Curated annotation (Swiss-Prot):
Gene3D superfamilies: 2.30.30.830. This is Competence protein D. Involved in transformation (genetic competence for DNA uptake). One of its GO terms (biological process) is establishment of competence for transformation. Keywords: Competence.
Length: 137
């Protein structure tokens, strides 16, 4: 019986041994690096999106979906980067960074705040005017 007790104690000690999550010297990656990796894996690359005269990116996120059909479902903000989570009507989630081309109309993500995301689209033949839209929770 004594041996079982020591084996159980040894087992629990072995299971509880690990890195201290509050020790900054043991950290080598942040949780946002992992989120960036996931975001890069889910990025939609579409070469058949028609080019906009105002410099729309051919790697547009949610290229077939109009902006008014997208819903803001989350925002992740860290020290050096921020990205927004947009959901379409088919419940697919797109993660977009600031400066990324989004939606069918070619809006660019200008600013990601805690409660909203601002989009801008260039208009006109010489792209001299702009249209602003905001999605919020």
């Amino acid at each position: 019986m004594k041996h079982w007790f020591f084996l159980i104690i040894l087992f629990f000690m072995n299971c509880s041994w690990g890195q201290d999550p509050f020790d900054k010297t043991q950290r080598n990656r942040s949780q946002f690096d992992n989120a960036q990796t996931v975001m890069e894996q889910t990025e939609i690359i579409s070469s058949d999106v028609p080019n906009n005269l105002c410099g729309a990116d051919e790697n547009r996120q949610a290229a077939e979906i109009p902006l008014n059909a997208l819903k803001l479902v989350g925002v992740v903000i860290s020290k050096d980067k921020a990205f927004a989570l947009l959901q379409d009507q088919g419940l697919q989630v797109y993660s977009v960074l600031e400066g990324v081309d989004v939606a069918q109309e070619g809006y660019i993500v200008e600013k990601i705040n805690q409660n909203n995301v601002q989009f801008m689209r260039k208009l006109g033949e010489q792209c001299d005017s702009s249209e602003w839209k905001k999605l919020s929770f």
